[in-house]
């Protein structure tokens, strides 16, 4: 099956079931910087969940905590009720796969070989079996190749199985990353900006592909900045701001939340993460401006021991100018009278 023949429409929704992923109190600090703070998020089976937020909100850092690339400073990540280990290959083996914000393919390997790499956690043959080319290894190799070809059919890349990955168009490289992730037979697929850099046609194809993945019973958690794409695709959306979950709910709820709009436009709002610090900065700036204005006024005032009728420097300038102008004006008037 290719994405051109997928009949799933954007109105199709999954039937959310039991929790697949549960992040509890996940916090990630880098020295004195808290990139992710006390995040709670659940993804259910048969569900597509979107994670949005401004640049630097901590979305990819949160993904890295989920997949074992980072060890959270605090909190736990559970998959199907079991706490995940802090090693990425064990997370993949447990049933979580991901793609990356920047494409990470093996550029000099073929399309088929890239997908076969994703099968390594699902084969049990060891080093000696591979070196000696034992019958069990050959059977596993054939099974992996058959499954890889099924995934290439599914993503519409079967006709390019022998092409080098670097020679694929950008949109097809994104599809290949998804096919490689699916090769590990995940129960949860994490997509980090899957439509970044795509044109509208490629974006629509990616949307159809994700719906088809969901229809196969795979839960999806997706980061994306294309709001039209995310609100059309997801059953539920969470907005992350400065490392904290600001709001979570249906696409319509999140889309209509003024706090989400304010977070994207950079307008502080009451109760926002970092709003208190922003208010302190604004107050300090206002105080500094007031002090500067007061200092300027003090500089224009005459000294305390100066005669009361002594004009200040600025007054003298004004008087001089006025006097000159007045004299000129008077002289001119007298000339006119004469």
Q: What do the PLM-derived regions correspond to, one by one?
A:
Residues 2-285, 289:
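Glycine-rich phosphate-binding loops of nucleotide-dependent enzymes
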Residues 267-338:
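ABC ATPase nucleotide-binding domains
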